[in-house]
Amino acid sequence: MNKLSEVTGLDKDNRLVAIRYANSVKKEDRTDRMEDYLEVIYELVQEKGYATTVDISSYLNVSSPSVTKMMQKLDETGYLKYEKYRGIKLTNEGTRIARNIRNRHGLLAEFFMIIGVDEETANNDAEGIEHHLHPETMKKLEEFINELKKHN
């Protein structure tokens, strides 16, 4: 048994299976970047009542043409309605996905803060991994946090 196996309790074959699984799972043909766009659009609409390509460009630190290209892709996939110079509106499915991402982010950030991570780092770390956790893992994490809250 090597050191990593001792720490993780996983042998090499199990780690390889996990790597294969992580690289084969598709999130309904969504990329992490698509989810970031949906999340930003949702947050902007919640905050301002609307989202513009300029706002999205600013928040995601990407060019306006990149935003326009992604808006067209998200429109084609049915996550939003986009008409150049007319605005951006999330579809019901786009809203559902954005809320789910927002909830995952909040849950992860809350967990990190419970274990003593400062808020800024907790949010940055949550942003980095919110797209990669299995729904069952998120469910168990939520149950764990709720149990902790009962005892505090």
Predicted segments with their positions:
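C-terminal regulatory/oligomerization modules of transcriptional regulators
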Residues: 1-13, 127-152
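N-terminal helix-turn-helix DNA-binding core of bacterial DNA-binding proteins
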Residues: 24-62
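N-terminal positioning helix adjacent to the helix-turn-helix/winged-helix DNA-binding module
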Residues: 33-36, 52, 93, 104, ...
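Canonical helix-turn-helix DNA-binding module
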Residues: 53-88
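Basic, amphipathic "hinge/linker" alpha-helix immediately C-terminal to the N-terminal HTH DNA-binding motif
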Residues: 86-105
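Arg/Lys-rich, alpha-helical DNA-contact motif
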Residues: 104-135
